[in-house]
Amino acid sequence: TGPDFIIGVRGTVDEMQKGGITANEGIEIAEQLRDSGLIDFFNVNRGRIHTDPAMTEMIPVAGMLSAPHLDIAGEIRRATGLPTFHASRIQDVATARYAIAAGHLDMVGMTRAHMADPHIVRKIQQGREETIRPCTGANYCLDRIYQGGMALCIHNAATGREETMPHVISRAAISRRVVIVGAGPAGLEAARVAASRGHDVTVFEAADAPGGQIRLTARTPRRKEMMGVIEWRMMQCENMSVVFHFNTLVGPNDVLKLSPDLVIIATGGVAQNQLYETQEHQPHLVTAWDILSGDIVPSGNVLIYDEAGDHAGLQAAEVALQAGARVEIMTPDRT
């Protein structure tokens, strides 16, 4: 390979666990590797991924601190004098710039950020940082990997599907009139893509603001970053002159008055509340949506039946606990 071949070492310099490698030991190991003269750079991380809680410390999710491990990466850089790389929830350009300017890193890893928007570098070079699609820390990508699936992105449908779904949207040969009913994530994505294709797009939404169920989930402080999915699409749509009508519940005749060439129904799902075979307990039955929206303030003894095993059930439990209720969760899931 020759003397100019670049060799780097990626490793954990602080396992954050009793009996594991400590920060001081990690620095000592890094210094010994430097003294060997065999390596040119370090790629530093902190923690372990042997459990789900440990993995979220090493690869932080939405609601956690931004770039929480820059300190140890900076210590390695200062102790060894070698170029240092690091990636751990550095999800935006401002944080990346700080990491370099403050002397913590020489190279910033933005893994999930590039899954959300693979054109980050190009947009920086072109002075279009405001158009970067933000990583919201949903960790859908990692959830899929650890379930044996492909690494996809909740915010960018093209990621992982490049063979069939291009990141760059081409213009249509003929411009058409498109009407979309619903301004949740699906409706906004349909509007964005249609407008990017050069179509004339109108969106109707019954609520007073866009977002749909994402607006509900984002009411919990630790999930507020999910609104980035909506805010980015709204900015894109507004820049392409998509017309929005909020507080507007439309029927077929309202839509047909616009003489559309294409109609897209994106009104989302409906909360499932048909839990009981009889109506005896119906007055006491509410949905997670009712709790997350604030329409219902839970009190007393609250039983949450969670068939989905996703965020909504536990978020509802969190809101109920904060309201002072006594909460019990029932689920068919094993864990």
PLM feature spans:
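Short, charged, surface-exposed secondary-structure boundary motifs
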Residues: 117-121, 213, 274-275, 295-297
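Rossmann-like dinucleotide/flavin-binding elements
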Residues: 175-206, 245-259, 266-335
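Short, contiguous acidic/charged loop-to-helix segments that flank catalytic cores in large enzymes
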Residues: 57-65, 168-170, 175-176, 216-228, ...
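Redox-cofactor binding/interface segments in oxidoreductases and associated redox assembly factors
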Residues: 44, 110, 264-266, 304
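Flavin-dependent oxidoreductase catalytic cores
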Residues: 1-181, 185, 189-196, 200-201, ...
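N-terminal Rossmann-like dinucleotide/flavin-binding domain of flavoprotein oxidoreductases
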Residues: 212-258
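Short connector loops at secondary-structure junctions
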Residues: 9, 45-50, 205-220, 228-235, ...
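Short acidic, glycine/proline-rich loop/turn micro-motifs
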Residues: 53-58, 213-218, 276-278
